[in-house]
Amino acid sequence: MMKARMLVLLSLALGTPSVVLAQAPVQLKFSRVVDLTLPIESNMAPIPGLKPYLNNPSRVNVISSITEAQKEALRAEGMTLSGDHEVNGRSMISVLSILVHNGTHIDAPRHMVENGIPIDQMPVAQFVKEGVLINLPGKEPNSVVTVKDVAESGVEIRPDTIVMINTGWTDKMWRKPGFWEQMPYLERGVAEYVANKGAAGLAIDVFPEKPLWRGVKLDPGEVWIANHLALMQKNLPLIQFVTNLSQIGNNRFTVVAAPLAIKGGEASPVRVIALVE
């Protein structure tokens, strides 16, 4: 636990490779840091029935270790050792293979919009914003997060904030049977409601669309990716499968969501933290 409040001055910049527009420094005061990110590991739970997930399981392959003792410790921790793993006396080295939409990740507009902005071209200032937390911990398995839930939560969605919706599902069910099969989901219109309030993005701990893999049907004329589109057509990011949101409490906080700068990419794994005042 930190004994004193910390003051961090972040100077953010926006621009293109040829033009950089300096912004005024952003002053952030916080007393603690909450990690909102699921760990990346081998065999992360895929969305049932979706081939991109099933055909591309996550892998963290350790190809070398320093000593035999380290190798056995890694094995005991559940790490995946490559078939050609070697003990080299020098260094541990790993190779990561992951579908970029697995675990805690951020979607850029290019994910759902043909000419959308790729993840590496989104302004980095868009990933450091004041956060707004909407707690909906009473959501039961297979339930729906509705526009009414969000509108009547008593939480003001301020412009230029990242809205975070907490059902507690990922905290309770990650790595457990039923994680996908009973997961609550967002009603069509939730993301549009948030975007129309002037939010800078949306972060959630569940899947944002109807779970077709368990037989939930679309309404006539309904587009399955409606919540994705509501954000991405406005160049707003969508962050999925955050965790530990309940640790923020009722405090003001700043969200820092740092994706990898994957050239031309539509999404990225992301380390999300909350700087809590």
Functional labels for PLM-detected ranges:
Residues 1-8:
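Bacterial N-terminal signal peptides that target proteins for export
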Residues 8-17:
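Bacterial N-terminal signal peptides
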Residues 22-277:
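Active-/binding-site microenvironments in catalytic and ligand-binding cores
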